[in-house]
Amino acid sequence: MSNDKDSMNMSDLSTALNEEDRAGLVNALKNKLQNLAGQHSDVLENLTPPVRKRVEFLREIQNQYDEMEAKFFEERAALEAKYQKLYQPLYTKRYEIVNGVVEVEGAAEEVKSEQGEDKSAEEKGVPDFWLIALKNNEITAEEITERDEGALKYLKDIKWSRVEEPKGFKLEFFFDQNPYFKNTVLTKTYHMIDEDEPILEKALGTEIEWYPGKCLTQKILKKKPKKGSKNTKPITKTEDCESFFNFFSPPQVPDDDEDLDDDMADELQGQMEHDYDIGSTIKEKIISHAVSWFTGEAVEADDLDIEDDDDEIDEDDDEEDEEDDEDDEEEDDEDDDEEEEADQGKKSKKKSSAGHKKAGRSQLAEGQAGERPPECKQQ
Protein backbone atom coordinates (compact mmCIF):
# COMPACT_ATOMS: atom_id res chain seq x y z
CA MET A 1 0.00 0.00 0.00
CA SER A 2 2.80 2.40 0.93
CA ASN A 3 4.63 1.68 -2.33
CA ASP A 4 1.53 2.64 -4.33
CA LYS A 5 1.27 5.84 -2.37
CA ASP A 6 4.93 6.67 -2.93
CA SER A 7 4.66 6.10 -6.70
CA MET A 8 1.54 8.25 -6.82
CA ASN A 9 3.35 11.09 -5.07
CA MET A 10 6.21 10.85 -7.55
CA SER A 11 3.79 11.10 -10.45
CA ASP A 12 2.07 14.09 -8.84
CA LEU A 13 5.42 15.74 -8.33
CA SER A 14 6.51 15.24 -11.94
CA THR A 15 3.33 16.74 -13.40
CA ALA A 16 2.79 19.51 -10.86
CA LEU A 17 6.25 21.11 -11.13
CA ASN A 18 7.12 23.07 -14.24
CA GLU A 19 10.55 24.64 -13.65
CA GLU A 20 12.13 26.51 -16.53
CA ASP A 21 15.38 24.92 -15.56
CA ARG A 22 15.05 21.16 -16.00
CA ALA A 23 17.88 20.58 -13.55
CA GLY A 24 15.76 22.13 -10.82
CA LEU A 25 13.02 19.61 -11.46
CA VAL A 26 15.48 16.73 -11.38
CA ASN A 27 16.86 18.00 -8.05
CA ALA A 28 13.34 18.08 -6.65
CA LEU A 29 12.88 14.48 -7.69
CA LYS A 30 16.19 13.53 -6.09
CA ASN A 31 15.15 15.17 -2.82
CA LYS A 32 11.91 13.21 -2.93
CA LEU A 33 13.82 9.99 -3.48
CA GLN A 34 16.12 10.79 -0.57
CA ASN A 35 13.13 11.33 1.70
CA LEU A 36 11.67 8.00 0.59
CA ALA A 37 15.03 6.34 1.17
CA GLY A 38 14.99 7.70 4.72
CA GLN A 39 11.55 6.20 5.30
CA HIS A 40 12.70 2.85 3.93
CA SER A 41 15.77 2.85 6.19
CA ASP A 42 13.43 3.26 9.16
CA VAL A 43 11.59 0.14 7.99
CA LEU A 44 14.84 -1.83 7.93
CA GLU A 45 15.77 -0.70 11.44
CA ASN A 46 12.50 -2.08 12.78
CA LEU A 47 13.24 -5.56 11.43
CA THR A 48 14.91 -8.28 13.47
CA PRO A 49 18.61 -8.82 12.59
CA PRO A 50 18.06 -12.12 10.71
CA VAL A 51 15.19 -10.69 8.64
CA ARG A 52 17.13 -7.47 7.99
CA LYS A 53 20.06 -9.52 6.71
CA ARG A 54 17.78 -11.37 4.29
CA VAL A 55 16.18 -8.16 3.06
CA GLU A 56 19.60 -6.60 2.48
CA PHE A 57 20.54 -9.62 0.37
CA LEU A 58 17.27 -9.22 -1.57
CA ARG A 59 18.21 -5.60 -2.24
CA GLU A 60 21.52 -6.74 -3.69
CA ILE A 61 19.60 -9.04 -6.04
CA GLN A 62 17.36 -6.10 -6.95
CA ASN A 63 20.42 -3.97 -7.76
CA GLN A 64 21.67 -6.68 -10.11
CA TYR A 65 18.27 -6.75 -11.79
CA ASP A 66 18.24 -2.94 -12.13
CA GLU A 67 21.64 -3.02 -13.82
CA MET A 68 20.40 -5.64 -16.30
CA GLU A 69 17.22 -3.65 -16.91
CA ALA A 70 19.22 -0.48 -17.60
CA LYS A 71 21.27 -2.41 -20.14
CA PHE A 72 18.05 -3.75 -21.67
CA PHE A 73 16.67 -0.22 -22.06
CA GLU A 74 19.92 0.90 -23.66
CA GLU A 75 19.99 -2.00 -26.13
CA ARG A 76 16.28 -1.62 -26.86
CA ALA A 77 16.73 2.06 -27.69
CA ALA A 78 19.59 1.20 -30.06
CA LEU A 79 17.52 -1.56 -31.68
CA GLU A 80 14.51 0.73 -32.11
CA ALA A 81 16.74 3.40 -33.66
CA LYS A 82 18.16 0.81 -36.07
CA TYR A 83 14.75 -0.38 -37.22
CA GLN A 84 13.37 3.14 -37.36
CA LYS A 85 15.92 3.81 -40.12
CA LEU A 86 14.92 0.59 -41.87
CA TYR A 87 11.26 1.63 -41.75
CA GLN A 88 11.88 4.97 -43.47
CA PRO A 89 11.97 3.65 -47.08
CA LEU A 90 8.63 1.91 -46.43
CA TYR A 91 7.13 5.10 -45.00
CA THR A 92 8.39 6.98 -48.07
CA LYS A 93 6.73 4.50 -50.43
CA ARG A 94 3.50 4.79 -48.45
CA TYR A 95 3.64 8.60 -48.66
CA GLU A 96 4.16 8.51 -52.43
CA ILE A 97 1.26 6.14 -53.05
CA VAL A 98 -1.15 7.88 -50.66
CA ASN A 99 -0.46 11.29 -52.23
CA GLY A 100 -0.40 10.13 -55.85
CA VAL A 101 3.30 10.85 -56.38
CA VAL A 102 3.74 7.37 -57.85
CA GLU A 103 1.20 4.96 -59.22
CA VAL A 104 0.83 1.31 -58.34
CA GLU A 105 1.32 -0.86 -61.41
CA GLY A 106 -1.99 -1.66 -63.06
CA ALA A 107 -4.09 0.68 -60.88
CA ALA A 108 -4.52 3.38 -63.54
CA GLU A 109 -5.53 0.84 -66.19
CA GLU A 110 -8.23 -0.62 -63.94
CA VAL A 111 -9.70 2.82 -63.28
CA LYS A 112 -9.74 3.64 -66.99
CA SER A 113 -11.59 0.46 -67.86
CA GLU A 114 -14.19 0.93 -65.11
CA GLN A 115 -14.82 4.67 -64.98
CA GLY A 116 -13.24 6.26 -68.03
CA GLU A 117 -10.14 8.35 -68.63
CA ASP A 118 -11.53 11.63 -67.22
CA LYS A 119 -12.19 10.13 -63.78
CA SER A 120 -8.77 8.48 -63.58
CA ALA A 121 -7.11 11.82 -64.27
CA GLU A 122 -8.94 13.41 -61.31
CA GLU A 123 -8.54 10.71 -58.67
CA LYS A 124 -4.96 10.22 -57.50
CA GLY A 125 -3.55 8.48 -54.49
CA VAL A 126 -5.82 7.49 -51.60
CA PRO A 127 -8.21 10.34 -50.72
CA ASP A 128 -8.75 11.11 -47.01
CA PHE A 129 -6.26 8.41 -46.04
CA TRP A 130 -5.08 9.94 -42.74
CA LEU A 131 -8.47 11.41 -41.86
CA ILE A 132 -10.13 7.99 -42.07
CA ALA A 133 -7.25 6.29 -40.23
CA LEU A 134 -7.53 8.78 -37.36
CA LYS A 135 -11.33 8.50 -37.24
CA ASN A 136 -11.14 4.71 -37.00
CA ASN A 137 -9.08 4.85 -33.81
CA GLU A 138 -11.16 5.32 -30.67
CA ILE A 139 -8.68 7.65 -28.93
CA THR A 140 -8.11 10.05 -31.83
CA ALA A 141 -11.69 9.87 -33.14
CA GLU A 142 -12.97 11.47 -29.93
CA GLU A 143 -10.96 14.60 -30.75
CA ILE A 144 -12.19 15.06 -34.33
CA THR A 145 -15.27 17.20 -34.96
CA GLU A 146 -17.17 17.62 -38.23
CA ARG A 147 -15.58 21.05 -38.66
CA ASP A 148 -12.11 19.46 -38.38
CA GLU A 149 -12.68 17.00 -41.20
CA GLY A 150 -12.38 19.60 -43.94
CA ALA A 151 -8.89 20.57 -42.75
CA LEU A 152 -7.75 17.00 -42.06
CA LYS A 153 -8.51 16.08 -45.67
CA TYR A 154 -5.34 18.04 -46.51
CA LEU A 155 -3.17 15.94 -44.17
CA LYS A 156 -0.52 14.26 -46.32
CA ASP A 157 1.65 12.44 -43.79
CA ILE A 158 2.46 11.95 -40.11
CA LYS A 159 5.96 11.18 -38.87
CA TRP A 160 7.62 10.78 -35.50
CA SER A 161 11.23 11.07 -34.38
CA ARG A 162 13.20 10.83 -31.15
CA VAL A 163 14.31 13.93 -29.28
CA GLU A 164 17.55 13.56 -27.35
CA GLU A 165 17.90 16.66 -25.18
CA PRO A 166 15.73 16.47 -23.22
CA LYS A 167 14.54 12.95 -23.96
CA GLY A 168 11.23 12.52 -25.70
CA PHE A 169 9.67 12.36 -29.13
CA LYS A 170 8.28 14.70 -31.78
CA LEU A 171 5.25 14.25 -34.04
CA GLU A 172 5.11 16.02 -37.40
CA PHE A 173 1.89 16.53 -39.36
CA PHE A 174 2.45 17.48 -43.00
CA PHE A 175 -0.35 19.39 -44.72
CA ASP A 176 -0.96 20.38 -48.30
CA GLN A 177 -1.83 24.01 -48.99
CA ASN A 178 -5.31 24.57 -47.64
CA PRO A 179 -7.84 27.34 -46.95
CA TYR A 180 -7.65 26.90 -43.15
CA PHE A 181 -4.09 27.80 -42.08
CA LYS A 182 -0.74 28.87 -43.52
CA ASN A 183 1.42 26.19 -41.83
CA THR A 184 2.52 23.26 -43.96
CA VAL A 185 3.90 21.38 -40.93
CA LEU A 186 2.40 21.22 -37.44
CA THR A 187 4.53 19.67 -34.70
CA LYS A 188 3.91 18.33 -31.22
CA THR A 189 6.89 17.57 -28.97
CA TYR A 190 6.82 15.62 -25.71
CA HIS A 191 9.70 16.13 -23.28
CA MET A 192 10.08 13.30 -20.79
CA ILE A 193 11.92 13.16 -17.47
CA ASP A 194 12.37 9.41 -17.90
CA GLU A 195 11.79 7.96 -21.35
CA ASP A 196 11.78 4.34 -20.18
CA GLU A 197 9.26 4.93 -17.41
CA PRO A 198 7.35 7.76 -19.13
CA ILE A 199 7.09 10.73 -16.82
CA LEU A 200 5.99 13.74 -18.83
CA GLU A 201 7.78 17.00 -18.11
CA LYS A 202 6.02 19.17 -20.68
CA ALA A 203 4.53 19.17 -24.17
CA LEU A 204 4.96 21.85 -26.82
CA GLY A 205 2.92 22.43 -29.98
CA THR A 206 3.08 24.59 -33.07
CA GLU A 207 1.17 27.86 -33.04
CA ILE A 208 -1.30 27.55 -35.91
CA GLU A 209 -1.55 30.54 -38.26
CA TRP A 210 -5.24 30.52 -39.05
CA TYR A 211 -6.65 32.38 -42.01
CA PRO A 212 -9.28 35.00 -41.06
CA GLY A 213 -12.55 33.37 -40.07
CA LYS A 214 -11.13 29.84 -40.44
CA CYS A 215 -10.00 29.09 -36.87
CA LEU A 216 -11.35 25.67 -35.88
CA THR A 217 -10.50 25.91 -32.18
CA GLN A 218 -12.81 28.87 -31.63
CA LYS A 219 -16.35 29.70 -32.63
CA ILE A 220 -17.96 33.09 -33.04
CA LEU A 221 -21.28 33.64 -31.31
CA LYS A 222 -23.58 36.43 -32.44
CA LYS A 223 -26.23 37.81 -30.14
CA LYS A 224 -28.94 40.32 -30.90
CA PRO A 225 -28.74 43.54 -28.87
CA LYS A 226 -31.29 44.03 -26.12
CA LYS A 227 -34.44 45.94 -26.94
CA GLY A 228 -34.02 49.65 -26.42
CA SER A 229 -30.24 49.45 -26.73
CA LYS A 230 -28.55 52.25 -28.65
CA ASN A 231 -26.25 49.73 -30.34
CA THR A 232 -28.25 48.01 -33.07
CA LYS A 233 -25.39 45.85 -34.36
CA PRO A 234 -25.25 42.17 -33.31
CA ILE A 235 -22.90 41.45 -30.42
CA THR A 236 -20.13 39.03 -31.41
CA LYS A 237 -18.34 36.86 -28.90
CA THR A 238 -15.46 34.43 -29.47
CA GLU A 239 -15.52 31.19 -27.51
CA ASP A 240 -13.15 28.21 -27.38
CA CYS A 241 -14.59 24.99 -28.76
CA GLU A 242 -13.68 21.33 -29.16
CA SER A 243 -11.33 20.54 -32.03
CA PHE A 244 -8.61 18.07 -32.98
CA PHE A 245 -6.34 21.08 -33.49
CA ASN A 246 -6.44 21.84 -29.76
CA PHE A 247 -3.90 19.01 -29.69
CA PHE A 248 -1.28 21.57 -30.76
CA SER A 249 -2.06 23.77 -27.74
CA PRO A 250 -1.35 21.32 -24.90
CA PRO A 251 -2.24 22.08 -21.28
CA GLN A 252 0.48 23.98 -19.44
CA VAL A 253 1.27 24.22 -15.75
CA PRO A 254 1.49 27.85 -14.55
CA ASP A 255 4.96 29.13 -13.68
CA ASP A 256 3.91 29.49 -10.05
CA ASP A 257 2.48 26.11 -9.09
CA GLU A 258 1.38 27.55 -5.72
CA ASP A 259 -1.58 29.06 -7.57
CA LEU A 260 -2.95 25.54 -8.07
CA ASP A 261 -5.23 23.99 -5.47
CA ASP A 262 -5.64 20.21 -5.23
CA ASP A 263 -8.70 20.08 -7.51
CA MET A 264 -7.05 22.23 -10.17
CA ALA A 265 -3.87 20.14 -9.99
CA ASP A 266 -5.84 16.89 -10.37
CA GLU A 267 -7.76 18.29 -13.33
CA LEU A 268 -4.57 19.53 -14.98
CA GLN A 269 -2.84 16.20 -14.43
CA GLY A 270 -5.79 14.41 -16.06
CA GLN A 271 -5.61 16.74 -19.06
CA MET A 272 -1.88 16.16 -19.48
CA GLU A 273 -2.29 12.38 -19.23
CA HIS A 274 -5.07 12.47 -21.83
CA ASP A 275 -2.93 14.62 -24.12
CA TYR A 276 -0.05 12.15 -23.79
CA ASP A 277 -2.39 9.23 -24.56
CA ILE A 278 -3.33 10.88 -27.85
CA GLY A 279 0.31 11.52 -28.78
CA SER A 280 1.51 8.02 -27.87
CA THR A 281 -1.43 6.46 -29.76
CA ILE A 282 -0.50 8.35 -32.92
CA LYS A 283 3.18 7.45 -32.47
CA GLU A 284 2.80 3.77 -31.61
CA LYS A 285 -0.38 2.75 -33.44
CA ILE A 286 -1.51 5.13 -36.17
CA ILE A 287 1.82 5.83 -37.88
CA SER A 288 3.11 2.27 -37.85
CA HIS A 289 -0.18 0.63 -38.95
CA ALA A 290 -1.88 3.44 -40.87
CA VAL A 291 -3.32 1.31 -43.68
CA SER A 292 -4.82 -1.13 -41.14
CA TRP A 293 -6.58 1.76 -39.43
CA PHE A 294 -7.72 3.08 -42.82
CA THR A 295 -9.28 -0.27 -43.77
CA GLY A 296 -10.63 -0.93 -40.27
CA GLU A 297 -8.60 -4.11 -39.74
CA ALA A 298 -6.83 -2.56 -36.76
CA VAL A 299 -10.20 -1.73 -35.22
CA GLU A 300 -11.22 -5.39 -35.43
CA ALA A 301 -7.94 -6.44 -33.82
CA ASP A 302 -8.53 -3.98 -30.97
CA ASP A 303 -12.09 -5.28 -30.57
CA LEU A 304 -10.79 -8.85 -30.35
CA ASP A 305 -8.41 -7.84 -27.55
CA ILE A 306 -11.29 -6.20 -25.69
CA GLU A 307 -13.49 -9.28 -26.18
CA ASP A 308 -10.72 -11.51 -24.84
CA ASP A 309 -10.56 -9.36 -21.71
CA ASP A 310 -14.36 -9.53 -21.38
CA ASP A 311 -14.28 -13.32 -21.78
CA GLU A 312 -11.78 -13.59 -18.94
CA ILE A 313 -14.04 -11.47 -16.75
CA ASP A 314 -17.08 -13.61 -17.72
CA GLU A 315 -15.17 -16.81 -16.88
CA ASP A 316 -14.33 -15.41 -13.46
CA ASP A 317 -17.99 -14.50 -12.94
CA ASP A 318 -19.08 -18.01 -14.00
CA GLU A 319 -16.67 -19.56 -11.52
CA GLU A 320 -18.03 -17.32 -8.77
CA ASP A 321 -21.61 -18.27 -9.71
CA GLU A 322 -20.72 -21.97 -9.58
CA GLU A 323 -19.15 -21.51 -6.14
CA ASP A 324 -22.27 -19.65 -4.96
CA ASP A 325 -24.49 -22.48 -6.27
CA GLU A 326 -22.38 -25.06 -4.44
CA ASP A 327 -22.63 -23.01 -1.23
CA ASP A 328 -26.43 -22.79 -1.63
CA GLU A 329 -26.66 -26.57 -2.14
CA GLU A 330 -24.60 -27.18 1.00
CA GLU A 331 -26.85 -24.85 3.00
CA ASP A 332 -29.96 -26.65 1.69
CA ASP A 333 -28.48 -30.02 2.69
CA GLU A 334 -27.77 -28.70 6.19
CA ASP A 335 -31.35 -27.42 6.50
CA ASP A 336 -32.71 -30.83 5.42
CA ASP A 337 -30.54 -32.58 8.02
CA GLU A 338 -31.82 -30.25 10.73
CA GLU A 339 -35.45 -30.94 9.78
CA GLU A 340 -34.88 -34.72 9.87
CA GLU A 341 -33.29 -34.43 13.32
CA ALA A 342 -36.23 -32.37 14.56
CA ASP A 343 -38.74 -34.95 13.27
CA GLN A 344 -36.85 -37.75 14.97
CA GLY A 345 -36.91 -35.79 18.22
CA LYS A 346 -40.70 -35.42 18.04
CA LYS A 347 -41.19 -39.14 17.39
CA SER A 348 -39.03 -40.06 20.36
CA LYS A 349 -41.17 -37.81 22.57
CA LYS A 350 -44.35 -39.63 21.60
CA LYS A 351 -42.86 -43.08 22.19
CA SER A 352 -41.51 -42.25 25.67
CA SER A 353 -43.71 -43.40 28.65
CA ALA A 354 -45.10 -41.18 31.38
CA GLY A 355 -42.86 -42.87 33.95
CA HIS A 356 -39.83 -41.74 32.04
CA LYS A 357 -40.87 -38.09 31.43
CA LYS A 358 -38.14 -36.59 33.58
CA ALA A 359 -35.46 -38.73 32.05
CA GLY A 360 -36.86 -38.01 28.60
CA ARG A 361 -36.87 -34.28 29.26
CA SER A 362 -33.27 -34.33 30.42
CA GLN A 363 -32.21 -36.40 27.43
CA LEU A 364 -34.14 -34.09 25.11
CA ALA A 365 -32.45 -31.05 26.62
CA GLU A 366 -29.09 -32.68 26.10
CA GLY A 367 -30.09 -33.62 22.57
CA GLN A 368 -31.14 -30.05 21.79
CA ALA A 369 -27.89 -28.72 23.10
CA GLY A 370 -25.90 -31.29 21.17
CA GLU A 371 -27.83 -30.91 17.91
CA ARG A 372 -27.50 -27.17 17.40
CA PRO A 373 -27.06 -26.02 13.80
CA PRO A 374 -23.47 -25.55 12.64
CA GLU A 375 -23.77 -21.75 12.69
CA CYS A 376 -24.73 -21.82 16.37
CA LYS A 377 -21.78 -24.04 17.20
CA GLN A 378 -19.43 -21.56 15.58
CA GLN A 379 -20.81 -18.80 17.76
From Swiss-Prot:
InterPro entries (alphabetical): NAP-like_sf (IPR037231), NAP_family (IPR002164)
Biased composition (Basic residues): 347-360
Tissue and organ expression note: Ubiquitous.
SUPFAM superfamilies registered for this protein in UniProt: NAP-like (SSF143113)
Keywords for the protein's UniProt record, in alphabetical order: Chaperone, Coiled coil, Cytoplasm, Lipoprotein, Methylation, Nucleus, Phosphoprotein, Prenylation
Placement of sequence motif Nuclear export signal: 47-62
Extent of motif Nuclear localization signal: 222-227
Description of the deletion phenotype: No visible phenotype.
Regulation: induction: By brassinosteroids.
Highest taxon above the source species: Eukaryota
Purpose: May modulate chromatin structure by regulation of nucleosome assembly/disassembly. May function in nucleotide excision repair (NER). Involved in somatic homologous recombination.
Assembly and oligomerization: Can form homomeric and heteromeric protein complexes with NAP1;1, NAP1;3 and NAP1;4. Binds histone H2A.
Protein name: Nucleosome assembly protein 1;2
